[in-house]
């Protein structure tokens, strides 16, 4: 499963509107989302409504609350640097999860050797129990925590742009490869929602939320039906089919004898 953020577009005035530069829609209402890492089906979500209220809102509290329905089932959990920390990963292992995620280099508990500068392709690994921390130099420094991988490099295919001329195998840390595969689910669902937004500029924020969640439900249903039927129906075609069936149902709704016609 994957823990990540999604965005419901909204540019009006509201106390808990956020800005997220890496999303297709930059301004809106943020959702914390748990999704199936393989197909992107959203399993659980929570809307961010600011720091008000009695609910604990530290990053660790948020992650543990979001993952509570899935504990003790040996799930791999993918998350990005906003959530990850050695302390959180220890808590998640105690609850039966195997977390994997990029991590901020400033997080408390990371090895001091991670301050060393590396040349491209170099790597530093440090293990504590079943948690592996690594720093790897690609185009930039990559910091990763994983409880599901060994300290090894794996081949990812041919690099056709070798500087020295000729092809050579591209090697990446196993944890980085696993993370890249596991993080696509929510990103794909969020991108699909941005392609087919159900919104108008004049609606209130709560209507934005309703239509945002309605869109999420339709995307979920499209993915589920494709899995069940072994098909690959595009979301656009699926939405047109839904609209057609709803329109036909409206036209064929029988009238009640004796009922007054609406003006």
Describe the predicted segments one by one.
Residues 1-263:
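Acidic, contiguous segments within the catalytic cores of piggyBac-derived transposases
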């Amino acid at each position: 499963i994957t823990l990540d953020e999604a965005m419901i577009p909204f540019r009006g005035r509201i106390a808990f509107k956020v800005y997220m530069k890496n999303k297709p829609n930059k301004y809106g209402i943020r959702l914390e989302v748990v999704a199936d890492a393989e197909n992107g089906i959203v399993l659980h979500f929570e809307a961010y409504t600011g720091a008000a209220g009695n609910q604990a809102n530290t990053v660790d509290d948020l992650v543990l609350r979001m993952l509570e329905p899935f504990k003790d089932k040996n799930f791999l959990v993918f998350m990005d640097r906003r959530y990850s920390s050695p302390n959180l990963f220890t808590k998640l292992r105690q609850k039966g999860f195997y977390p994997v995620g990029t991590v901020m280099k400033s997080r408390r508990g990371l090895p001091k050797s991670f301050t060393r500068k590396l040349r491209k392709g170099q790597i530093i690994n440090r293990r504590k129990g079943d948690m592996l921390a690594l720093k790897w130099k690609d185009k930039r420094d990559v910091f990763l925590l994983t409880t599901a991988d060994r300290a090894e490099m794996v081949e990812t295919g041919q690099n056709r742009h070798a500087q020295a001329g000729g092809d050579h195998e591209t090697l990446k840390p196993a944890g980085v490869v696993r993370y890249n595969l596991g993080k696509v689910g929510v990103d794909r669902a969020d991108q699909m929602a941005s392609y087919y937004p159900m919104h108008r500029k004049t609606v209130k924020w709560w209507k934005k939320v309703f239509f945002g969640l309605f869109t999420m439900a339709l995307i979920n249903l499209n993915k589920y039906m494709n899995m069940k039927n072994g098909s690959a129906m595009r979301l656009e075609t699926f939405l047109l089919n839904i609209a057609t069936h709803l329109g036909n149902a409206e036209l064929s709704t029988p009238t009640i004898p004796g009922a007054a016609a609406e003006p």
